[in-house]
Curated annotation (Swiss-Prot):
Activity regulation summary: Phosphorylation increases DNA binding affinity.
Residues bearing the modification Phosphoserine: S128
Taxon lineage: Bacteria, Thermotogati, Deinococcota, Deinococci, Deinococcales
Organism: Deinococcus radiodurans (strain ATCC 13939 / DSM 20539 / JCM 16871 / CCUG 27074 / LMG 4051 / NBRC 15346 / NCIMB 9279 / VKM B-1422 / R1)
The gene coding this protein: pprA
Identification of the protein by name: DNA repair protein PprA
Substitution effect: T88A: Strong decrease in phosphorylation. Lack of phosphorylation
Length: 300
């Protein structure tokens, strides 16, 4: 028979190992959430916040704030819904939409994308047909500037439909309470963003014969398909596990409050700021995706 002291020590060690494993899994969930937010250019610091031993309420508030910021950049057109994220008792992070669970981070990024897909209503341009507000006046997108100025300066809750902007962008504006929201969008799905990045990678290949071969393959399989086909057999599956395969920056929302929210000049400045931010974020995304396609799909 084993000594009692050994049994006690052994049980203690097993308990410590189980706690360490659970902590590692939870830390991995926090890091995965931060990585998901990075696809929207959101500097989420949930892993660091959790490491500082912040309480559950503080973590839930930070999770929700990051998710709502990401919703303004993913361009899914779900502004009319309430978005929250919270910790679960078993160490996961649950994503909620209008109070109902949509997916858990542990289920993978694709699961969240699939949950959001039926909620969307995109037109042929990739723009949301949903109103940003549940209620309120909706003006046409081609509203004359003089009338738009009146709405911005005097109207209560309102929104406009999409109108064409510069550089293949689209724009709309809405007011909710004391806040004016200015959105600029350039629809580019995650797949399209990856294809753009694949083009950059192929264009940078110095081996011209190999480059020509990939261009030939792209006629059948597309840029991304050609590049993945030239990698190892698991490259496509590895890519599908990354958040970049499902989410990308397609829009930017700039907000104004107080007196600025009723100033037409401030609105025009916000429009320029949003357009510039969108241009920057989409450019950064393409460069980051190019690096992923070059180096980040190694065999595991």
């Amino acid at each position: 028979m084993l000594p009692l002291a050994f049994l006690i020590c052994s049980g203690h060690n097993k308990g410590s190992m189980a706690r360490a494993k659970a902590k590692d899994q939870t830390d991995g969930i926090y890091a995965a959430f931060d990585t998901l937010m990075s696809t929207a250019g959101v500097d989420s610091q949930i892993a660091a916040l959790a490491a500082s031993e912040a309480d559950a309420g503080t973590l839930d508030a930070a999770l929700t704030q990051s998710l709502q910021e990401a919703q303004g950049r993913w361009g899914l057109g779900l502004h009319h819904l309430r978005h929250e994220a919270r910790l679960t008792d078993d160490g996961d992070i649950e994503i909620l939409t209008d109070g109902r669970p949509s997916a858990r981070v542990s289920e993978g990024f694709g699961a969240l994308a699939q949950a959001y897909a039926p909620m969307q209503a995109l037109d042929e341009r990739g723009l949301s047909q949903w109103a940003a507000l549940g209620e309120g006046y909706r003006a046409p997108g081609d509203l004359p500037l003089a009338q738009l100025k009146v709405l911005i300066e005097h109207a209560r809750d309102f929104e406009t439909d999409w109108s064409a902007g510069r550089g293949e962008t689209f724009q709309r504006v809405w007011r909710k309470g004391d806040t004016l929201f200015v959105e600029v969008a350039r629809p580019a799905s995650a797949e399209a963003a990856l294809s753009d990045a694949a083009w950059d990678v192929i264009a940078s290949i110095k081996d011209r014969a190999f480059q020509r071969e990939l261009m030939r393959r792209s006629e059948k399989d597309g840029m991304l398909g050609a590049l993945l086909g030239a990698r190892h057999a698991g490259a496509k599956a590895n890519l599908a596990q990354l958040p970049e395969a499902h989410f990308t920056v397609q829009a930017f929302v700039q907000t104004l409050s107080g007196a600025a929210a009723r100033n037409a000049e401030e609105y025009r400045a916000a429009l320029k700021t949003a357009a510039a931010a969108l241009e920057e974020y989409q450019g950064v995304t393409t460069r980051q995706l190019s690096e992923v396609l070059r180096h980040g799909l190694r065999e595991s």
